[in-house]
């Protein structure tokens, strides 16, 4: 990433604040978050917001909001130090529940580049660029303190899995932003704790993700523990139905002195 990615942090924070303020005016978006088990405290702490369908307030301020972000719940993506690097948007209406996350790239390096992007937008050729996911972990900024305290981190797949864990008090978690665990991810996590606890979806994709995790974590001296969810569950749906009691009991079992395997699995 270049230094340009960190320019205009004050403006990015202002956008995040405004999007967060927008949220309270849209009952459907608020209800969706409540149904996902995401508390108001976490909504505010994480800076979750909403981009209305008609929203273009920042179009002419060297900041380009992709039309794909409109009508979506917005999530600021932060680096380990809390700086905003991008936004993700999530459709929440029933007709488009499974639409892929769209990313808002907001780093035009000059007014002329900003104007060029606006012109592209007007011609229907907007830019929908992503950010380098292999160098970032969602929620790391909020998770660091508890990771140090507990000496372990939950690994989850999705942003909303992470946010739901936060709402249940399991703040020591990170989401992989739609990519597999990289060497950079593992090295970064090893700075804060010794053990990774994989809490992945109970499907084939979740199992495949585990195959790569163990050797990657082993390279940096981290242990891998696995909590297997029942079939058909992902972390947020499991927590909504069962709470965190069994998950915490599984962690206690894994951390006992007589359980010293580098890879250890508990089925819920």
Regions found by a protein language model. Give the residues of each.
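Phosphate-handling DNA/RNA-contact segment within nucleic-acid enzymes
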Residues: 51-193, 209-210
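C-terminal or mid-to-C-terminal helical accessory/interaction module adjacent to the motor/catalytic core
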Residues: 225-268
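TOPRIM metal-binding catalytic domain and adjacent DNA-binding surface shared by DnaG-type primases
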Residues: 1-73, 81, 144-148, 258-268
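Short, aromatic/basic amphipathic alpha-helical patches
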Residues: 209-217
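Acidic beta-strand-to-loop metal/phosphate-binding motif
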Residues: 153-155, 193-205, 227-228
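Arginine/glycine-rich "motif VI" loop of SF2 helicases in the C-terminal RecA-like domain
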Residues: 188, 216-222
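Conserved nucleotide-binding/hydrolysis micro-motifs of P-loop NTPases
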Residues: 160, 180, 203-205, 230-234
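Hydrophobic anchor at the start of a short beta-strand
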Residues: 172-174, 196, 223-225
């Amino acid at each position: 990433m270049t230094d340009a990615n960190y320019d205009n942090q004050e403006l990015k924070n202002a956008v995040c604040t405004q999007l967060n303020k927008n949220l309270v005016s849209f009952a459907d978006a608020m209800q969706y978050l409540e149904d996902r088990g995401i508390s108001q405290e976490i909504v505010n702490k994480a800076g979750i917001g909403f981009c209305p369908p008609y929203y273009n307030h920042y179009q002419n301020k060297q900041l380009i909001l992709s039309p794909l972000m409109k009508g979506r719940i917005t999530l600021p993506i932060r680096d380990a130090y809390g700086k905003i690097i991008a936004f993700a948007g999530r459709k929440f209406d029933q007709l488009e529940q499974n639409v892929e996350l769209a990313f808002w790239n907001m780093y035009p390096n000059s007014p002329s580049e900003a104007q060029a992007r606006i012109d592209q937008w007007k011609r229907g050729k907007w830019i929908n660029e992503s950010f380098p996911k292999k160098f970032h972990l969602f929620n790391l900024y909020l998770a660091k303190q508890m990771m140090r305290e507990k000496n372990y981190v939950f690994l989850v797949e999705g942003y909303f899995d992470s946010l739901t864990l936060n709402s249940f008090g399991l703040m020591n978690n990170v989401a992989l932003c739609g990519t597999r665990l990289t060497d950079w991810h593992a090295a970064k996590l090893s700075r804060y704790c010794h053990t990774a606890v994989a809490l992945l979806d109970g499907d084939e994709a979740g199992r495949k993700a585990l195959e790569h995790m163990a050797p990657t974590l082993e390279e940096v001296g981290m242990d891998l523990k696995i909590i297997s969810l029942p079939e058909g569950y992902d972390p947020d749906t499991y927590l909504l139905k069962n709470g965190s009691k069994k998950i915490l009991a599984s962690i206690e079992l894994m951390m006992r002195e007589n359980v010293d395997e580098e890879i250890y699995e508990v089925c819920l």
